[in-house]
Amino acid sequence: MGLSFAKLFSRLFAKKEMRILMVGLDAAGKTTILYKLKLGEIVTTIPTIGFNVETVEYKNISFTVWDVGGQDKIRPLWRHYFQNTQGLIFVVDSNDRDRVVEARDELHRMLNEDELRDAVLLVFANKQDLPNAMNAAEITDKLGLHSLRQRHWYIQSTCATSGEGLYEGLDWLSNNIAGKA
């Protein structure tokens, strides 16, 4: 009896670790999101050539977040980060109407990869503070998210600079990855 209670207690309260891959087109706000979550502040960023990796502690969960550069020349490298990924954060610049089709194509190409078949998908519809930003429903439509019948996904409106929506997204991720474990 005592042993099973101890197991239950440790399962409920032990720190959980989750491997998260964050990708999206260049200038979507991935690095700003990563450091807003990690440091709680806005940092000056330059285009990511390669990757940034940080551990973000939130609600007894340790998220290892891999932020991979989004320039078209380095997108083929994304697949090298797929292994053991439990959650995929796809960041979209909600104000970039000219490249939303490109974002959709990259997302669907990635989701067809076998190594990501079990990963849950969180879409951050970023830059919601900009006046012409597409809302989450429009982004859902433009990315073709409703066609992802076999995928557990969620879209969260965010503003990386203020932090708005970021923790709601992490809550969804943690609940849905933990539910699959």
From Swiss-Prot:
CDD domains referenced in this protein's UniProt entry, alphabetically: Arf1_5_like
**Which Gene Ontology BP annotations are present?**
protein transport; vesicle-mediated transport
Q: Does the keyword Protein transport apply?
A: yes
Taken from the record, one Pfam family name reads Arf
Nucleotide-binding keyword on record: yes
Q: Indicate which residues the UniProt annotation says bind GTP.
A: 24-31, 67-71, 126-129
Where does the UniProt annotation locate this protein? Golgi apparatus
Which GO molecular function, any one, fits this protein according to its record? phospholipase activator activity
Q: Which GO terms describe its cellular component?
A: Golgi apparatus; mitochondrion; plant-type vacuole; plasma membrane
Stated regulation of activity = Activated by AGD10.
Per the record, lipidation of type N-myristoyl glycine is found at G2
Q: Which UniProt keywords apply?
A: ER-Golgi transport, Golgi apparatus, GTP-binding, Lipoprotein, Myristate, Nucleotide-binding, Protein transport, Transport
What's the stated role of this polypeptide? GTP-binding protein involved in protein trafficking; may modulate vesicle budding and uncoating within the Golgi apparatus.
What the record says about family reads:
Belongs to the small GTPase superfamily. Arf family.
| Name of the protein | ADP-ribosylation factor 2-B
